[in-house]
Amino acid sequence: MYLKTFLEKKMRTFEQYVEDLKKMKPNVYIGSEVVGRDDTRLEGGMNIIRETFDHVNEPEYEDLCTATSHLTGKKINRFCHIHQSEEDLLKKQKMTRVLCHRVGGCIQRCMGIDSLNALSIITYEMDQALGTEYYERFKKYLINFQDKDLVASCAQTDAKGDRLKRPHQQEDPDQYLRVIETRDDGIIVRGCKINITNTPYADEFIVIPCRYMGPEDNDYVVAFALPCDWEGVKLLTRPAYFRKSEFVDAPGLHMGDAETFIIFDDVFVPKDRIFLNGHGDPLQTPYAGFLALMFAHYHRFTYCGCKPAMSEILASAALLVAEYNGIEKASHVQEKISHIIGIAELVFAAGESSAKHSEKSPSGTQIPDEILTNAGRRLAGENIYEEYKILTDISGGLIATLPFEGSFFSEEVGPLAMKYLKRNPRVKPEYIYRCFRGIENMVVSDLGGLLQVAGVHGGGSPQMETITMMMRYDTEKLKDISKYLFGIKSKLRKYERPNVTPRKMLEKFGKAMKRKKKT
Protein backbone atom coordinates (compact mmCIF):
# COMPACT_ATOMS: atom_id res chain seq x y z
CA MET A 1 0.00 0.00 0.00
CA TYR A 2 2.84 2.39 0.89
CA LEU A 3 4.61 1.61 -2.39
CA LYS A 4 1.44 2.32 -4.37
CA THR A 5 0.94 5.63 -2.56
CA PHE A 6 4.60 6.50 -3.16
CA LEU A 7 4.37 5.75 -6.88
CA GLU A 8 1.10 7.68 -7.22
CA LYS A 9 2.34 10.81 -5.46
CA LYS A 10 0.48 13.90 -6.68
CA MET A 11 2.17 15.68 -9.53
CA ARG A 12 3.21 19.31 -9.45
CA THR A 13 0.47 21.86 -10.07
CA PHE A 14 0.66 25.11 -11.98
CA GLU A 15 0.13 27.02 -8.75
CA GLN A 16 3.12 25.29 -7.13
CA TYR A 17 5.21 26.04 -10.21
CA VAL A 18 4.36 29.76 -10.00
CA GLU A 19 5.10 29.89 -6.27
CA ASP A 20 8.51 28.33 -6.88
CA LEU A 21 9.26 30.91 -9.58
CA LYS A 22 8.41 33.76 -7.22
CA LYS A 23 11.08 32.51 -4.79
CA MET A 24 13.83 32.95 -7.39
CA LYS A 25 16.30 35.84 -7.25
CA PRO A 26 15.57 38.71 -9.65
CA ASN A 27 18.02 38.40 -12.55
CA VAL A 28 15.71 39.12 -15.49
CA TYR A 29 16.55 42.30 -17.40
CA ILE A 30 13.71 43.79 -19.47
CA GLY A 31 15.33 46.81 -21.02
CA SER A 32 17.24 48.43 -18.16
CA GLU A 33 14.90 47.09 -15.47
CA VAL A 34 15.78 44.12 -13.28
CA VAL A 35 12.54 42.29 -12.52
CA GLY A 36 11.35 39.22 -10.67
CA ARG A 37 9.25 36.36 -11.98
CA ASP A 38 6.11 38.17 -10.81
CA ASP A 39 6.46 40.77 -13.56
CA THR A 40 3.20 40.83 -15.53
CA ARG A 41 5.07 40.82 -18.86
CA LEU A 42 6.08 37.21 -18.16
CA GLU A 43 2.57 35.98 -17.38
CA GLY A 44 1.74 35.04 -20.97
CA GLY A 45 4.58 32.54 -21.16
CA MET A 46 3.64 31.07 -17.79
CA ASN A 47 0.07 30.65 -19.00
CA ILE A 48 1.36 28.52 -21.86
CA ILE A 49 3.38 26.36 -19.46
CA ARG A 50 0.19 26.01 -17.41
CA GLU A 51 -1.27 23.77 -20.11
CA THR A 52 1.53 21.24 -19.48
CA PHE A 53 0.47 20.93 -15.83
CA ASP A 54 -3.31 21.24 -15.90
CA HIS A 55 -4.23 18.20 -18.01
CA VAL A 56 -2.13 15.41 -16.51
CA ASN A 57 -5.04 14.02 -14.49
CA GLU A 58 -7.79 14.52 -17.07
CA PRO A 59 -8.95 11.27 -18.75
CA GLU A 60 -8.89 12.90 -22.20
CA TYR A 61 -5.23 13.88 -21.90
CA GLU A 62 -3.66 11.71 -19.18
CA ASP A 63 -2.36 8.96 -21.46
CA LEU A 64 -0.60 11.51 -23.67
CA CYS A 65 0.58 13.90 -20.95
CA THR A 66 2.01 11.37 -18.49
CA ALA A 67 4.45 8.48 -18.63
CA THR A 68 6.13 5.97 -16.32
CA SER A 69 9.70 6.81 -15.40
CA HIS A 70 12.11 4.11 -16.59
CA LEU A 71 14.30 4.93 -13.57
CA THR A 72 11.82 5.02 -10.67
CA GLY A 73 8.59 3.47 -11.97
CA LYS A 74 6.70 6.59 -10.91
CA LYS A 75 4.02 8.35 -12.90
CA ILE A 76 5.64 11.50 -14.30
CA ASN A 77 4.87 14.36 -16.63
CA ARG A 78 5.76 13.36 -20.20
CA PHE A 79 7.75 16.59 -20.45
CA CYS A 80 10.17 14.94 -18.01
CA HIS A 81 10.35 11.55 -19.74
CA ILE A 82 13.17 9.83 -21.62
CA HIS A 83 11.71 8.01 -24.63
CA GLN A 84 11.99 4.24 -24.23
CA SER A 85 9.98 3.03 -27.22
CA GLU A 86 8.37 3.87 -30.52
CA GLU A 87 5.12 4.39 -28.60
CA ASP A 88 6.79 7.00 -26.39
CA LEU A 89 7.93 8.95 -29.43
CA LEU A 90 4.47 8.83 -31.00
CA LYS A 91 2.78 9.97 -27.78
CA LYS A 92 5.22 12.86 -27.42
CA GLN A 93 4.43 13.97 -30.97
CA LYS A 94 0.67 13.72 -30.43
CA MET A 95 0.86 15.46 -27.04
CA THR A 96 2.77 18.34 -28.58
CA ARG A 97 0.20 18.70 -31.34
CA VAL A 98 -2.88 18.78 -29.11
CA LEU A 99 -1.37 21.10 -26.50
CA CYS A 100 -0.17 23.54 -29.16
CA HIS A 101 -3.78 23.77 -30.35
CA ARG A 102 -4.75 24.97 -26.88
CA VAL A 103 -2.20 27.80 -26.75
CA GLY A 104 -2.22 28.94 -30.37
CA GLY A 105 1.43 28.13 -31.01
CA CYS A 106 4.57 26.81 -29.32
CA ILE A 107 4.01 24.92 -26.05
CA GLN A 108 7.48 26.06 -24.88
CA ARG A 109 8.35 23.06 -22.71
CA CYS A 110 9.89 20.77 -25.31
CA MET A 111 13.41 22.22 -25.41
CA GLY A 112 14.29 21.00 -21.94
CA ILE A 113 13.21 17.41 -22.39
CA ASP A 114 14.66 17.24 -25.91
CA SER A 115 18.05 18.19 -24.46
CA LEU A 116 17.70 15.64 -21.65
CA ASN A 117 16.94 12.88 -24.15
CA ALA A 118 20.08 13.85 -26.05
CA LEU A 119 22.16 13.85 -22.85
CA SER A 120 20.80 10.42 -21.89
CA ILE A 121 22.45 9.05 -25.04
CA ILE A 122 25.70 10.99 -25.13
CA THR A 123 26.63 10.66 -21.44
CA TYR A 124 26.18 6.89 -21.59
CA GLU A 125 28.26 6.48 -24.73
CA MET A 126 30.98 8.75 -23.37
CA ASP A 127 31.20 6.66 -20.22
CA GLN A 128 31.47 3.48 -22.26
CA ALA A 129 34.21 4.90 -24.47
CA LEU A 130 36.19 7.04 -22.02
CA GLY A 131 35.48 5.64 -18.57
CA THR A 132 33.88 8.88 -17.38
CA GLU A 133 31.03 8.92 -14.85
CA TYR A 134 28.62 11.28 -16.54
CA TYR A 135 25.74 8.87 -17.04
CA GLU A 136 25.34 8.09 -13.33
CA ARG A 137 25.52 11.82 -12.63
CA PHE A 138 22.92 12.45 -15.31
CA LYS A 139 20.57 9.81 -13.88
CA LYS A 140 20.70 11.42 -10.43
CA TYR A 141 19.93 14.77 -11.99
CA LEU A 142 17.09 13.28 -14.03
CA ILE A 143 15.44 11.56 -11.06
CA ASN A 144 15.34 14.87 -9.20
CA PHE A 145 14.08 16.60 -12.34
CA GLN A 146 11.26 14.07 -12.73
CA ASP A 147 10.34 14.01 -9.03
CA LYS A 148 10.01 17.80 -8.93
CA ASP A 149 8.37 18.01 -12.39
CA LEU A 150 10.76 20.79 -13.37
CA VAL A 151 10.41 23.07 -16.37
CA ALA A 152 13.66 23.45 -18.30
CA SER A 153 14.98 25.76 -20.96
CA CYS A 154 17.67 24.59 -23.37
CA ALA A 155 20.51 27.02 -24.03
CA GLN A 156 22.23 25.97 -27.25
CA THR A 157 22.75 28.88 -29.66
CA ASP A 158 25.95 30.87 -29.07
CA ALA A 159 26.54 34.50 -30.06
CA LYS A 160 28.96 33.07 -32.71
CA GLY A 161 30.72 36.35 -33.60
CA ASP A 162 32.29 36.08 -37.07
CA ARG A 163 30.22 33.39 -38.78
CA LEU A 164 33.11 32.42 -41.06
CA LYS A 165 35.39 31.51 -38.15
CA ARG A 166 35.42 28.52 -35.82
CA PRO A 167 35.18 29.07 -32.05
CA HIS A 168 38.93 29.03 -31.42
CA GLN A 169 39.52 31.43 -34.34
CA GLN A 170 37.31 34.24 -33.03
CA GLU A 171 38.92 37.60 -32.31
CA ASP A 172 36.88 37.68 -29.09
CA PRO A 173 37.15 34.18 -27.55
CA ASP A 174 33.92 34.68 -25.60
CA GLN A 175 31.70 34.64 -28.71
CA TYR A 176 31.12 30.96 -27.97
CA LEU A 177 30.44 29.88 -24.40
CA ARG A 178 33.68 28.47 -23.00
CA VAL A 179 35.25 26.97 -19.92
CA ILE A 180 37.94 29.29 -18.58
CA GLU A 181 38.89 27.15 -15.58
CA THR A 182 38.46 23.52 -14.53
CA ARG A 183 38.69 22.85 -10.78
CA ASP A 184 38.21 19.79 -8.60
CA ASP A 185 34.78 21.04 -7.51
CA GLY A 186 33.56 22.32 -10.87
CA ILE A 187 34.22 24.74 -13.72
CA ILE A 188 34.05 28.47 -14.47
CA VAL A 189 32.28 29.43 -17.71
CA ARG A 190 32.06 32.68 -19.65
CA GLY A 191 29.99 33.64 -22.67
CA CYS A 192 26.44 34.06 -23.90
CA LYS A 193 23.63 31.93 -25.28
CA ILE A 194 21.11 33.76 -27.48
CA ASN A 195 17.58 33.25 -28.88
CA ILE A 196 16.63 31.11 -25.87
CA THR A 197 12.92 30.55 -25.24
CA ASN A 198 11.15 30.49 -21.83
CA THR A 199 14.22 30.93 -19.56
CA PRO A 200 12.73 33.61 -17.22
CA TYR A 201 9.90 31.27 -16.26
CA ALA A 202 11.80 27.98 -16.32
CA ASP A 203 13.17 26.31 -13.20
CA GLU A 204 16.48 25.37 -14.81
CA PHE A 205 18.34 25.72 -18.07
CA ILE A 206 20.40 23.03 -19.75
CA VAL A 207 23.46 24.23 -21.66
CA ILE A 208 24.78 22.25 -24.62
CA PRO A 209 27.13 22.99 -27.55
CA CYS A 210 25.62 24.54 -30.66
CA ARG A 211 27.87 22.92 -33.25
CA TYR A 212 30.53 20.41 -34.17
CA MET A 213 33.80 21.22 -32.39
CA GLY A 214 37.20 20.43 -33.88
CA PRO A 215 40.38 19.35 -32.08
CA GLU A 216 41.33 23.00 -31.40
CA ASP A 217 37.97 23.86 -29.82
CA ASN A 218 38.33 21.95 -26.53
CA ASP A 219 37.53 24.97 -24.32
CA TYR A 220 34.11 25.30 -25.96
CA VAL A 221 33.05 21.72 -25.34
CA VAL A 222 30.74 21.93 -22.34
CA ALA A 223 27.30 20.84 -21.15
CA PHE A 224 25.70 21.48 -17.78
CA ALA A 225 22.47 22.38 -15.97
CA LEU A 226 21.80 25.23 -13.53
CA PRO A 227 18.85 26.95 -11.86
CA CYS A 228 17.79 29.99 -13.88
CA ASP A 229 18.60 32.42 -11.06
CA TRP A 230 22.13 31.08 -10.49
CA GLU A 231 24.83 33.47 -9.28
CA GLY A 232 26.46 35.34 -12.18
CA VAL A 233 23.70 34.51 -14.69
CA LYS A 234 21.96 37.49 -16.29
CA LEU A 235 18.83 37.04 -18.41
CA LEU A 236 18.39 39.80 -21.01
CA THR A 237 14.78 39.18 -21.92
CA ARG A 238 12.40 40.32 -24.64
CA PRO A 239 8.83 39.36 -23.69
CA ALA A 240 6.12 39.21 -26.35
CA TYR A 241 2.41 39.31 -25.62
CA PHE A 242 -0.90 40.46 -27.03
CA ARG A 243 -2.53 43.80 -26.32
CA LYS A 244 -4.82 43.38 -23.32
CA SER A 245 -8.56 43.63 -23.92
CA GLU A 246 -10.90 45.72 -21.79
CA PHE A 247 -14.12 44.44 -23.31
CA VAL A 248 -13.56 41.05 -24.97
CA ASP A 249 -11.79 38.15 -23.28
CA ALA A 250 -10.48 35.04 -25.06
CA PRO A 251 -8.06 32.23 -24.11
CA GLY A 252 -5.60 33.18 -26.84
CA LEU A 253 -5.15 36.69 -25.46
CA HIS A 254 -3.53 35.34 -22.30
CA MET A 255 -0.61 33.65 -24.07
CA GLY A 256 2.89 35.06 -24.49
CA ASP A 257 6.57 34.32 -24.96
CA ALA A 258 9.97 35.46 -23.73
CA GLU A 259 13.23 35.21 -25.67
CA THR A 260 16.51 35.70 -23.86
CA PHE A 261 20.23 36.34 -24.06
CA ILE A 262 21.68 34.26 -21.20
CA ILE A 263 24.91 35.93 -20.11
CA PHE A 264 27.42 33.89 -18.10
CA ASP A 265 29.63 36.37 -16.29
CA ASP A 266 32.36 33.98 -15.04
CA VAL A 267 29.82 31.55 -13.62
CA PHE A 268 30.77 28.64 -11.37
CA VAL A 269 29.16 25.30 -12.27
CA PRO A 270 29.34 22.58 -9.57
CA LYS A 271 30.82 19.25 -10.58
CA ASP A 272 27.59 17.30 -10.07
CA ARG A 273 25.87 19.47 -12.69
CA ILE A 274 28.45 19.03 -15.47
CA PHE A 275 27.80 16.52 -18.28
CA LEU A 276 30.59 17.37 -20.75
CA ASN A 277 33.92 19.20 -20.37
CA GLY A 278 36.49 19.22 -23.17
CA HIS A 279 38.57 21.81 -21.33
CA GLY A 280 39.22 19.34 -18.53
CA ASP A 281 39.52 16.33 -20.85
CA PRO A 282 40.14 16.88 -24.59
CA LEU A 283 39.09 13.27 -25.27
CA GLN A 284 35.51 14.47 -24.71
CA THR A 285 35.67 16.98 -27.57
CA PRO A 286 34.25 14.59 -30.25
CA TYR A 287 31.01 14.40 -28.27
CA ALA A 288 30.21 18.12 -28.67
CA GLY A 289 28.95 17.75 -32.23
CA PHE A 290 27.25 14.47 -31.35
CA LEU A 291 25.33 16.17 -28.53
CA ALA A 292 24.58 19.34 -30.51
CA LEU A 293 23.06 17.43 -33.38
CA MET A 294 21.29 14.88 -31.17
CA PHE A 295 19.43 17.70 -29.43
CA ALA A 296 18.63 19.32 -32.79
CA HIS A 297 17.39 15.93 -33.98
CA TYR A 298 14.99 15.49 -31.06
CA HIS A 299 13.85 19.09 -31.37
CA ARG A 300 13.15 18.67 -35.08
CA PHE A 301 11.16 15.56 -34.21
CA THR A 302 9.18 17.72 -31.77
CA TYR A 303 8.59 20.20 -34.57
CA CYS A 304 6.87 17.40 -36.48
CA GLY A 305 4.21 17.70 -33.77
CA CYS A 306 4.08 21.44 -33.15
CA LYS A 307 4.36 22.67 -36.74
CA PRO A 308 1.36 20.62 -37.91
CA ALA A 309 -0.52 22.17 -34.99
CA MET A 310 0.55 25.64 -36.09
CA SER A 311 -0.58 24.89 -39.64
CA GLU A 312 -3.92 23.63 -38.33
CA ILE A 313 -4.35 26.80 -36.26
CA LEU A 314 -3.76 28.90 -39.38
CA ALA A 315 -6.08 26.68 -41.44
CA SER A 316 -8.73 26.95 -38.73
CA ALA A 317 -8.52 30.75 -38.78
CA ALA A 318 -8.60 30.78 -42.59
CA LEU A 319 -11.71 28.59 -42.64
CA LEU A 320 -13.46 30.75 -40.06
CA VAL A 321 -12.70 34.07 -41.72
CA ALA A 322 -13.70 32.62 -45.10
CA GLU A 323 -17.08 31.67 -43.61
CA TYR A 324 -17.48 35.08 -41.98
CA ASN A 325 -16.52 36.77 -45.26
CA GLY A 326 -19.07 34.57 -47.05
CA ILE A 327 -16.52 33.03 -49.41
CA GLU A 328 -15.95 29.59 -47.86
CA LYS A 329 -17.29 27.77 -50.94
CA ALA A 330 -15.08 29.62 -53.43
CA SER A 331 -12.77 27.18 -55.24
CA HIS A 332 -9.65 29.31 -54.80
CA VAL A 333 -10.29 29.45 -51.04
CA GLN A 334 -10.69 25.68 -50.86
CA GLU A 335 -7.50 25.18 -52.84
CA LYS A 336 -5.46 27.50 -50.63
CA ILE A 337 -6.67 26.04 -47.37
CA SER A 338 -6.09 22.51 -48.65
CA HIS A 339 -2.44 23.49 -49.15
CA ILE A 340 -2.08 24.34 -45.45
CA ILE A 341 -3.86 21.14 -44.40
CA GLY A 342 -1.66 19.10 -46.73
CA ILE A 343 1.53 20.55 -45.23
CA ALA A 344 0.25 19.81 -41.72
CA GLU A 345 -0.46 16.19 -42.56
CA LEU A 346 2.82 15.62 -44.42
CA VAL A 347 4.94 17.09 -41.62
CA PHE A 348 3.11 15.03 -39.01
CA ALA A 349 3.49 11.93 -41.20
CA ALA A 350 7.25 12.54 -41.38
CA GLY A 351 7.36 12.56 -37.59
CA GLU A 352 5.24 9.43 -37.31
CA SER A 353 7.40 7.65 -39.86
CA SER A 354 10.59 8.70 -38.06
CA ALA A 355 9.18 7.15 -34.89
CA LYS A 356 8.23 3.98 -36.79
CA HIS A 357 11.80 3.78 -38.12
CA SER A 358 13.39 4.62 -34.76
CA GLU A 359 16.11 2.60 -33.07
CA LYS A 360 17.20 2.01 -29.49
CA SER A 361 20.48 3.57 -28.41
CA PRO A 362 22.92 1.69 -26.14
CA SER A 363 21.51 3.65 -23.17
CA GLY A 364 18.00 2.44 -23.98
CA THR A 365 16.75 5.79 -25.27
CA GLN A 366 14.69 5.57 -28.45
CA ILE A 367 16.05 7.65 -31.35
CA PRO A 368 13.83 8.61 -34.32
CA ASP A 369 15.16 8.40 -37.87
CA GLU A 370 17.19 11.51 -38.66
CA ILE A 371 16.42 11.99 -42.34
CA LEU A 372 12.67 11.85 -41.81
CA THR A 373 12.69 14.36 -38.94
CA ASN A 374 14.78 16.76 -41.00
CA ALA A 375 12.58 16.28 -44.06
CA GLY A 376 9.49 17.10 -42.00
CA ARG A 377 11.03 20.10 -40.28
CA ARG A 378 12.37 21.50 -43.56
CA LEU A 379 8.99 21.19 -45.27
CA ALA A 380 7.40 23.11 -42.39
CA GLY A 381 10.04 25.86 -42.41
CA GLU A 382 9.88 26.35 -46.16
CA ASN A 383 6.10 26.77 -46.10
CA ILE A 384 5.40 28.80 -42.97
CA TYR A 385 5.28 32.20 -44.71
CA GLU A 386 3.19 30.74 -47.52
CA GLU A 387 0.66 29.62 -44.90
CA TYR A 388 0.56 33.08 -43.34
CA LYS A 389 0.22 34.55 -46.84
CA ILE A 390 -2.83 32.35 -47.48
CA LEU A 391 -4.45 33.43 -44.21
CA THR A 392 -3.71 37.08 -45.04
CA ASP A 393 -5.08 36.69 -48.56
CA ILE A 394 -8.36 35.18 -47.39
CA SER A 395 -8.73 37.62 -44.48
CA GLY A 396 -8.09 40.82 -46.42
CA GLY A 397 -6.39 44.00 -45.23
CA LEU A 398 -8.71 44.48 -42.26
CA ILE A 399 -6.44 42.36 -40.05
CA ALA A 400 -3.91 45.22 -40.19
CA THR A 401 -6.29 48.20 -40.23
CA LEU A 402 -9.01 47.23 -37.73
CA PRO A 403 -9.80 50.22 -35.45
CA PHE A 404 -8.86 49.90 -31.80
CA GLU A 405 -11.15 47.97 -29.49
CA GLY A 406 -12.55 51.04 -27.76
CA SER A 407 -14.19 52.23 -30.97
CA PHE A 408 -16.32 49.08 -31.20
CA PHE A 409 -17.56 49.39 -27.62
CA SER A 410 -17.99 53.14 -27.51
CA GLU A 411 -21.51 54.43 -26.83
CA GLU A 412 -21.07 57.04 -29.54
CA VAL A 413 -19.45 55.14 -32.43
CA GLY A 414 -19.64 51.49 -31.33
CA PRO A 415 -22.92 50.66 -33.12
CA LEU A 416 -21.60 52.26 -36.30
CA ALA A 417 -18.32 50.37 -36.08
CA MET A 418 -20.16 47.07 -35.69
CA LYS A 419 -22.57 47.99 -38.51
CA TYR A 420 -19.77 48.46 -41.02
CA LEU A 421 -17.88 45.40 -39.85
CA LYS A 422 -20.81 43.19 -40.83
CA ARG A 423 -20.22 40.62 -43.59
CA ASN A 424 -22.05 37.29 -43.53
CA PRO A 425 -25.59 38.17 -42.34
CA ARG A 426 -25.83 34.86 -40.46
CA VAL A 427 -22.90 35.77 -38.17
CA LYS A 428 -23.12 38.12 -35.19
CA PRO A 429 -20.99 41.28 -35.58
CA GLU A 430 -19.30 40.51 -32.25
CA TYR A 431 -18.08 37.16 -33.62
CA ILE A 432 -16.79 38.86 -36.75
CA TYR A 433 -14.96 41.36 -34.56
CA ARG A 434 -13.45 38.55 -32.46
CA CYS A 435 -12.33 36.71 -35.59
CA PHE A 436 -10.56 39.68 -37.16
CA ARG A 437 -8.98 40.73 -33.87
CA GLY A 438 -7.76 37.17 -33.35
CA ILE A 439 -6.18 36.98 -36.81
CA GLU A 440 -4.65 40.43 -36.27
CA ASN A 441 -2.93 38.95 -33.21
CA MET A 442 -1.77 35.94 -35.22
CA VAL A 443 -0.33 37.91 -38.12
CA VAL A 444 0.64 41.49 -37.26
CA SER A 445 1.24 41.55 -33.49
CA ASP A 446 4.55 41.39 -31.66
CA LEU A 447 3.99 37.75 -30.72
CA GLY A 448 2.59 36.90 -34.15
CA GLY A 449 5.74 38.18 -35.83
CA LEU A 450 7.93 36.22 -33.44
CA LEU A 451 6.09 32.98 -34.22
CA GLN A 452 6.57 33.52 -37.95
CA VAL A 453 10.34 33.87 -37.57
CA ALA A 454 10.38 30.91 -35.17
CA GLY A 455 8.56 28.89 -37.82
CA VAL A 456 11.59 29.33 -40.07
CA HIS A 457 14.50 29.20 -37.63
CA GLY A 458 13.26 27.36 -34.53
CA GLY A 459 15.02 24.02 -34.19
CA GLY A 460 17.23 24.89 -37.15
CA SER A 461 16.60 26.71 -40.41
CA PRO A 462 15.72 24.81 -43.63
CA GLN A 463 19.34 25.19 -44.70
CA MET A 464 20.50 23.25 -41.63
CA GLU A 465 18.00 20.49 -42.35
CA THR A 466 19.25 20.36 -45.93
CA ILE A 467 22.86 20.01 -44.78
CA THR A 468 21.95 17.25 -42.33
CA MET A 469 19.91 15.30 -44.86
CA MET A 470 22.64 15.42 -47.49
CA MET A 471 25.29 14.42 -44.94
CA ARG A 472 23.28 11.36 -43.93
CA TYR A 473 21.90 10.21 -47.28
CA ASP A 474 24.07 7.69 -49.13
CA THR A 475 24.03 9.54 -52.45
CA GLU A 476 26.56 7.20 -54.08
CA LYS A 477 24.26 4.21 -53.64
CA LEU A 478 21.37 6.34 -54.84
CA LYS A 479 23.25 7.02 -58.09
CA ASP A 480 23.38 3.27 -58.74
CA ILE A 481 19.69 3.31 -59.68
CA SER A 482 20.34 5.67 -62.60
CA LYS A 483 23.56 3.88 -63.53
CA TYR A 484 21.56 0.67 -63.92
CA LEU A 485 18.68 2.32 -65.80
CA PHE A 486 21.09 4.08 -68.16
CA GLY A 487 23.15 0.94 -68.83
CA ILE A 488 26.25 2.19 -67.02
CA LYS A 489 26.04 -0.71 -64.53
CA SER A 490 24.77 -4.16 -65.46
CA LYS A 491 23.29 -5.03 -62.05
CA LEU A 492 21.20 -3.23 -59.48
CA ARG A 493 21.24 -4.31 -55.88
CA LYS A 494 18.10 -3.72 -53.88
CA TYR A 495 18.24 -0.19 -52.51
CA GLU A 496 16.67 0.58 -49.16
CA ARG A 497 17.86 3.57 -47.18
CA PRO A 498 19.05 2.47 -43.74
CA ASN A 499 17.92 4.29 -40.60
CA VAL A 500 20.36 7.00 -39.54
CA THR A 501 21.03 9.00 -36.36
CA PRO A 502 23.44 11.83 -35.39
CA ARG A 503 26.08 9.28 -34.33
CA LYS A 504 27.80 10.01 -37.65
CA MET A 505 29.16 13.20 -36.06
CA LEU A 506 31.73 11.10 -34.19
CA GLU A 507 33.16 9.94 -37.52
CA LYS A 508 33.55 13.57 -38.62
CA PHE A 509 35.77 14.30 -35.62
CA GLY A 510 37.87 11.22 -36.32
CA LYS A 511 38.55 12.46 -39.85
CA ALA A 512 39.51 15.89 -38.49
CA MET A 513 42.01 14.28 -36.11
CA LYS A 514 43.61 12.37 -38.99
CA ARG A 515 43.98 15.60 -40.97
CA LYS A 516 45.52 17.31 -37.95
CA LYS A 517 48.11 14.54 -37.52
CA LYS A 518 49.11 14.81 -41.18
CA THR A 519 49.81 18.51 -40.81
What do the PLM-derived regions correspond to, one by one?
Residues 6-69:
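Acidic/polar, glycine-rich intrinsically disordered N-terminal extensions of enzymes
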Residues 43, 47-50, 143-146, 309-312, ...:
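Generic structural signal for well-ordered, non-transmembrane alpha-helical segments
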Residues 50-53, 322, 344, 348-351, ...:
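A structural signal for well-ordered alpha-helices, especially hydrophobic packing surfaces
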Residues 67-204, 210-224, 229, 234:
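Glycine-rich flavin
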Residues 159-303, 473-512:
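FAD-binding core of flavoproteins
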Residues 302-360:
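Extended amphipathic alpha-helical segments enriched in small hydrophobics
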Residues 334-338, 366-374:
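Short, charged, amphipathic alpha-helical segments
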Residues 371-514:
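Alpha-helix capping/hinge segments and adjacent helical runs
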